Regions:
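Short, Lys/Arg-enriched N-terminal segments with co-localized hydrophobic residues
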Residues: 2-15
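Conserved beta-strand hairpin/beta-sheet module of binuclear metal-dependent hydrolase folds
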Residues: 12-64, 156-168
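Short Pro/Gly-enriched beta-strand edge/turn motifs at strand-loop
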Residues: 14-21, 113-117, 138-139
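Short, glycine/acidic-enriched loop or turn micro-motifs at the edges of active sites
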Residues: 41-42, 52, 78, 101, ...
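Short catalytic-loop micro-motif centered on adjacent basic/acidic residues
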Residues: 45-48, 70-72, 144-146
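Residue-level marker for buried hydrophobic side chains located in beta-strands
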Residues: 46, 72, 95, 166, ...
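Active-site HxH/HxHxD metal-binding segment of metal-dependent hydrolases
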Residues: 52-136
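Metallo-beta-lactamase
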Residues: 111-112, 140-223
């Protein structure tokens, strides 16, 4: 099911398509958000956090006639990578993840794949990213923000052109991700939110891993 279809035009030149899919990741939450971002002019696309149901993601990419350039993982947990192998095999695309969480893709004690009923995937990323790196999908630019806390290598993606933030499991609607898991830290996640994410423009739209997108400043700061 498609919850959001957003097309935006910047300066009459750049057209961005953003699709939010609800996929079954096998967790207690069951349905989680997977995002597809595409530059409509070049057809280049990026999938963010393919937590499950690879067929649903692939079907949408085919509908968009997308050229999958990147598969971006905000961190290494199993409920964010459930569709990773099939998606990579069938559509290509380079796997990107923050350098600190890269090891977790092949370490079930960090990825917690057993928790979501997955086998250990033993997969290495094609490239690693770090804080302030930039990623381009056609003419759309995203900046990597290292947001440790939920995991030590958690990251968020920010698009300054449209003030969009993909926050993974760091920031939700009025709350934050769990900090009782391997490599997680309560102090780190609060610092990531207060010192990095809350310093973005007030009208930034937050697209989290679960629940709805929002741009209500009060719900981002009343933590």
């Amino acid at each position: 099911m498609i919850l959001k279809i957003i097309s935006k035009v910047w300066k009459g030149k750049i057209v961005m398509i953003l699709k939010q899919l609800r996929v079954n990741s096998g967790t207690i939450c069951e349905l989680t958000n997977c995002y597809i971002v595409q530059d409509e002019n070049t057809k280049e696309a990026m999938v963010i956090d393919p937590g499950g149901e690879a067929g649903k993601i692939i079907e949408m990419l085919d509908i968009l006639q997308a050229k999958l350039k990147y598969i971006y993982l905000t961190h290494c947990h199993g409920d964010h990578i459930g569709a990773l192998i099939e998606l990579k095999d069938k559509k290509g695309g380079k796997i990107l993840i923050h350098r600190i969480d890269a090891e977790g893709l092949s370490n079930k004690n960090i990825s917690l794949t057993e928790y979501v009923g997955m086998e250990d995937i033993n997969l290495e990323p094609d490239s690693i990213v770090d804080d302030n790196d930039t990623i381009h999908i056609g003419d759309i630019e995203f900046r990597v923000i290292h947001t440790p806390g939920h995991t030590s290598g958690s990251s968020s993606l920010y698009c300054e052109q449209e003030k969009l933030l993909f926050s993974g499991d760091t920031l939700f609607y009025g709350t934050w991700g769990r900090t009782d898991l391997p490599t997680s830290s309560f102090d780190d996640i609060i610092n990531s939110i207060t010192e990095k994410l809350l310093k973005l423009p007030d009208d930034t739209i937050v697209y989290p891993r679960t629940w709805k997108a929002y741009n209500d400043k009060r719900r981002k700061t009343d933590l």
